[in-house]
From Swiss-Prot:
Family of this protein: Belongs to the RNA polymerase alpha chain family.
One of the GO BP terms on file: DNA-templated transcription
Phylogenetic classification of the source organism: Bacteria, Pseudomonadati, Pseudomonadota, Gammaproteobacteria, Alteromonadales
A cellular component annotation (GO) from this entry: DNA-directed RNA polymerase complex
Region (Alpha C-terminal domain (alpha-CTD)): 248-329
Transmembrane segments: none
Name of the coding gene: rpoA
Protein name as it appears in the record: DNA-directed RNA polymerase subunit alpha
Subunit text: Homodimer. The RNAP catalytic core consists of 2 alpha, 1 beta, 1 beta' and 1 omega subunit. When a sigma factor is associated with the core the holoenzyme is formed, which can initiate transcription.
Stated role: DNA-dependent RNA polymerase catalyzes the transcription of DNA into RNA using the four ribonucleoside triphosphates as substrates.
Catalytic activity: RNA(n) + a ribonucleoside 5'-triphosphate = RNA(n+1) + diphosphate
Length: 329
């Protein structure tokens, strides 16, 4: 297959291999030589850093004032609990944030399944362990989940918080990306007689909140939108061409019939070879009154119709009629 030098092969989605519920391999081919690494690296960076998702941003635990402490009856310290909460895979529908609550008592593990939430919130990993209780102890907490993009450290959020932030409200480093791991591999591909093509294999692990195929589609859309600016690229030093203004107002080039005058007035104008509005506005009141069968009533009608369009009788138009109309007259 030998095409034009300006034509490039377009890849197509060939296969999606679901390795496990959160991991999949997506294969795209054929790609022109070198495009496997070009597109693979670009998609990888977007998938890791620019995909929107949901993450825990704040936590309040009853009886806890700061993260460098522990809670009686809980096996993990507070820092470990916050780290475990960062592993929650949450989907929020129809809004940008949600408040979750958790209350548990009695010895044993505390998991994401123990969290109470609204119907527009879905927790994709209910078996995720948050902490372990010992003895006949309990734990209660409120968890704020927000939609966002990229990675936002707690220190950055603290700078924007008011100084009156309640003691005990713990800020969490938030990784909003639903993609936990992404790697790509470029293999050889063949189309007919061409053997120098690329096959792109993307190995993706997510937190279960997004389908791998949808993740590829979203990342490709983001990349395409950013590249649109280069498609429309223009030399900034190139002087912009000024649009030439029309010699006459377009309304002057329209036939007098567009004024929707009475039959009597319209016939009088046609008898005087007044075919266009530009012809009409150059006439004076005295000239029109000399027109047979055109009286003051018709004159008043014509003046009112012209005034409604910002025109009047007695206007002077240089170079009238234009060449486009002169041939028709």
């Amino acid at each position: 297959m030998q095409g034009s030098v300006t034509e490039f092969l377009k890849p197509r989605l060939v296969d999606i291999e679901q390795v496990n519920p959160t991991r999949a391999k997506v294969t795209l081919e054929p790609l022109e030589r070198g495009f496997g690494h070009t597109l693979g690296n670009a998609l990888r960076r977007i998938l890791l850093s620019s995909m929107p998702g949901c993450a825990v941003t704040e936590v309040e635990i009853d009886g806890v004032l700061h993260e460098y402490s522990s809670k009686e009856g809980v096996q993990e310290d507070i820092l470990e609990i916050l780290l475990n909460l960062k592993g929650l895979a949450v989907v929020i529908e129809g809004k940008d944030e949600a408040m979750l609550t958790l209350s548990k008592s009695g010895a044993g593990p505390v998991t994401a399944a123990d969290i109470t939430h609204d119907g527009d919130v879905t927790i994709m990993n209910p078996d995720h362990v948050i902490c372990h209780l010992t003895g006949n102890n309990d734990i209660s907490m409120r968890i704020r989940v927000e939609r966002g993009r990229g990675y936002v450290p707690a220190s950055a959020r603290a700078q924007t918080e008011d100084d009156d932030r309640p003691i005990g409200r713990l800020l969490v480093d938030s990784s909003f990306s639903p993609v936990a791991r992404i790697a790509y591999n470029v293999e050889a591909a063949r189309v007919e007689q061409r053997t120098d093509l690329d096959k792109l294999v993307i190995d993706m692990t997510t937190n279960g909140t997004i389908d791998p195929e949808e993740a590829i589609r979203r990342s490709a859309t983001i990349l395409a939108e950013q590249l649109d600016a280069f498609v429309e690229l223009r030399d900034v030093t190139e002087p912009e061409q000024k649009e030439e203004k029309p010699e006459f107002d377009p309304i002057l080039l329209r036939p007098v019939d567009d004024l929707e005058l009475t039959v009597r007035s319209a016939n009088c104008l046609k008898a005087e070879a007044i075919h266009y509005i530009g012809d009409l506005v150059q006439r004076t009141e005295v000239e029109l009154l000399k027109t047979p069968n055109l009286g003051k009533k018709s004159l008043t009608e014509i003046k009112d119709v012209l005034a409604s369009r910002g025109l009047s009788l007695g206007m002077r138009l240089e170079n009238w009629p234009p060449a486009s109309l002169a041939d028709d007259l």
